[in-house]
Amino acid sequence: MGRPELGALRPLALLLLLLLQLQHLSAADPLPGGQGPVKECEEDQFRCRNERCIPLVWRCDEDNDCSDNSDEDDCPKRTCADSDFTCDNGHCIPERWKCDGEEECPDGSDESKATCSSEECPAEKLSCGPTSHKCVPASWRCDGEKDCEGGADEAGCPTLCAPHEFQCSNRSCLASVFVCDGDDDCGDGSDERGCSDPACPPREFRCGGGGTCIPERWVCDRQFDCEDRSDEAAELCGRAGQGTTATPAACAPTAQFTCRSGECIHLGWRCDGDRDCKDKSDEADCSPGPCRENEFQCGDGTCVLAIKRCNQERDCPDGSDEAGCLQESTCEGPRRFQCKSGECVDGGKVCDDQRDCRDWSDEPQKVCGLNECLHNNGGCSHICTDLKIGFECTCPAGFQLLDQKTCGDIDECQDPDACSQICVNYKGYFKCECHPGYEMDTLTKNCKAVAGKSPSLIFTNRHEVRRIDLVKRDYSRLIPMLKNVVALDVEVATNRIYWCDLSYRKIYSAHMDKASIPDEQVVLIDEQLHSPEGLAVDWVHKHIYWTDSGNKTISVATTDGRRRCTLFSRELSEPRAIAVDPLRGFMYWSDWGFQAKIEKAGLNGADRQTLVSDNIEWPNGITLDLLSQRLYWVDSKLHQLSSIDFNGGNRKMLIFSTDFLSHPFGVAVFEDKVFWTDLENEAIFSANRLNGLEIAILAENLNNPHDIVIFHELKQPKAADACDLSAQPNGGCEYLCLPAPQISSHSPKYTCACPDTMWLGPDMKRCYRAPQSTSTTTLASAMTRTVPATTRAPGTTIHDPTYQNHSTETPSQTAAAPHSVNVPRAPSTSPSTPSPATSNHSQHYGNEGSQMGSTVTAAVIGVIVPIVVIALLCMSGYLIWRNWKRKNTKSMNFDNPVYRKTTEEEEEDELHIGRTAQIGHVYPAAISNYDRPLWAEPCLGETRDLEDPAPALKELFVLPGEPRSQLHQLPKNPLSELPVVKCKRVALSLEDDGLP
């Protein structure tokens, strides 16, 4: 058989090439419509059979995430752990989630009747009844909140008050001392009904109009204690014609406005449309003026923020902010359709074979009637919904669209207020849990305390401190007969309370059970206090911190008041509230000065930084939620209650209200409630701290309620004192051992500090007297803090008898030491920390195990020896130079014949010719205010000698910036006062040496 011809094979070859090309095109475009190449998934994704990509962690989780169940193929059978509950469909959930009121099993078997009916409540819990199968802590019984669905935990609760209490008409209990005291403490007036005006006890004075009784020592003390100011009446105090004799605190006339009620506010708040004074005197006699640039003027002349214009809320009293607003037409929603030509038609008119849009865009022939979801679910990862025109991808609850087709999990825990305390994110949902000591209320989903006694709310009411039991609703007086108490705090472990009295300018402490007894009230701090308005207790390290708006300082002391020092005295204008976090070593404070702000620093004064400086006007009270790590504050000017995290981020305005936040002052947080005092409303309010809702009044008709705290052991968690963990007592510190901020794992645990009149030594542990400068007063003042000097603090040893107590106010009264030692000060470790003049505590972080081998003798020798060596070297150099100058200097005396003929009795100059490379002598520069320069004038006659040239020398070498003494006046030429050598009277005859 012969070979086929080449021409006969060509058709076969072309056919083969055509088949190969078709196969290639089919492989490149496997899906109809040409949807592109095969989709590749990321490394952390799983590729389904239908080419979808899902997170790899969704593989074998018993959920059909691929929609074709390919992610659950060939998966091993799961076995739940002993600590888990096995759902009927095989899912595993934590055992604590069983019968908690929420269905975590996909089939709901964890909350089924068969599962929960067999459960019995433990002894420490209360059953909500046979039908609910729910258990609640026994401490929640009769706490005023319904925790069971049917309210079984609040059923049958006794309503009778204790024998020493008064039951109000609203069924609340009140201490008998509040009955017939002139204040409506019940809230319904039942405690003041049928009351006569009883006489005041001995040594007390009744205010006018049947008012309250005050101690007689408060009468005519130049401070208003009665609401009607009758205790300072001119006729009573014997100062007729002078009006009231009380003198309110002086306000800065150039920067502040004095309210008639005595407060000081910023001068710019006068006539700004907002009532800032308690008596509203800052808005009295104000002419209507234009609003600010960021404000809108209402029809009645009032001003509101411009952003509130046309917000569909009535902000102006006359509603003019919503007048004339154009409502934008939207074409959104399933029942509306946006035409390409711009019209908006009803969704039911789409694909009805009738033209409703001008461009026929509602009747596309190729799309109407086409169901895209039938092919590959429209490309949607979860839910595909067919529309009349096109389709839409949606996601189940807990998921969100990432790229219009793929669903991804929503991390609900990104919201800091998603849960009461702990938020755990899961695929498609999240779970809330509670910290130890708390338990979830399945009805409200809030964490409630189960450990410790019932929480109490303690607040100052100017003349007394009161307490409200938040569970039993008992209302009692804790400390009576106080002068003007503003700030307070508590130490739960020792059951002590601390408070500041502005009138007496003292800080007190007392045991809670004996605080009403004057003899049990201990004075902790009574010196160098002006206006202590903020107070905080470090319950771990046993310290108290306070702000002083008069001295512009923040200070710290031990809880017994024996050791104290000033941490900050710079860049403070009006410091007010202060709060501490001993667990992390930080403190926080508010400053309502001209540049209002909230700041943060370490408990040792290091790492100072500003957290809030914008959109803040009058920050008063601040408080910390240590569990959620958030800071809450109230702004009396903006009428807001806001919060941030401990680093200043995630800012959130919780409440804005001119009614409930008219003039807030103090704020406190516990569980899911936030509490605050209001001076204008004279009441205490509470609200939900997560959403700002559920606003309620706890107490009203008060007299200047200021600070407020919560007394409960969970508010002050126990922790180890770093200073006690050291091998040496008090961390090796001679005076104060202060905790350092825990910024990282390498942060030191503590640093040492000294009293204001002493400095930290080279070993960073011992304290020394500040060396007295002998040069000028200005130099000494620049190196010391600005607070007045005090006597030696108790417990401090003076190691060098030559050191003197240093005072920046009267430095000339203390004799300088013969050999003063300049102890080097520790530099600041943070750029945000004030200059060294603001603090005398250590900023160097030594190891805890370092030895105290460095002594005062070593420190003195280490400073004096180099000075002596330098002085000897300088003296030796001077003697060598003087000897060399004498050897290299020759003198020549000669007579001028011409001059001799005329004036033979004139003195001749003595010329010194030196063999030096320099011509003449350079005089030191002198600081002078004279117009003409100072020159060394030649000797032209007799000159007088100065007995003591020191005064003139001192005036010539005054340091820059130092004031000149007025006792010694400079002459016209200061150099003429320097000691000079008299010109010698000589008579020389020149012999003829052959000169021409």
Swiss-Prot record:
One of its GO terms (molecular function) is very-low-density lipoprotein particle receptor activity. It comes from Mus musculus (Mouse). The chain crosses the membrane at residues 859-881. This is Low-density lipoprotein receptor-related protein 8. The lineage of its organism: Eukaryota, Metazoa, Chordata, Craniata, Vertebrata. Residues 364-408, 409-448 form the EGF-like domain. Residues 773-831 are annotated as: Clustered O-linked oligosaccharides. Ca(2+) binds at residues 58, 61, 63, 65, 71-72. GO terms for cellular component: axon; caveola; cell surface; dendrite; extracellular space; glutamatergic synapse; microtubule associated complex; neuronal cell body. The gene is Lrp8. Belongs to the LDLR family. Residues 1-28 form the signal peptide. CDD domains: EGF_CA, LDLa. Cell surface receptor for Reelin (RELN) and apolipoprotein E (apoE)-containing ligands. LRP8 participates in transmitting the extracellular Reelin signal to intracellular signaling processes, by binding to DAB1 on its cytoplasmic tail. Reelin acts via both the VLDL receptor (VLDLR) and LRP8 to regulate DAB1 tyrosine phosphorylation and microtubule function in neurons. LRP8 has higher affinity for Reelin than VLDLR. LRP8 is thus a key component of the Reelin pathway which governs neuronal layering of the forebrain during embryonic brain development.
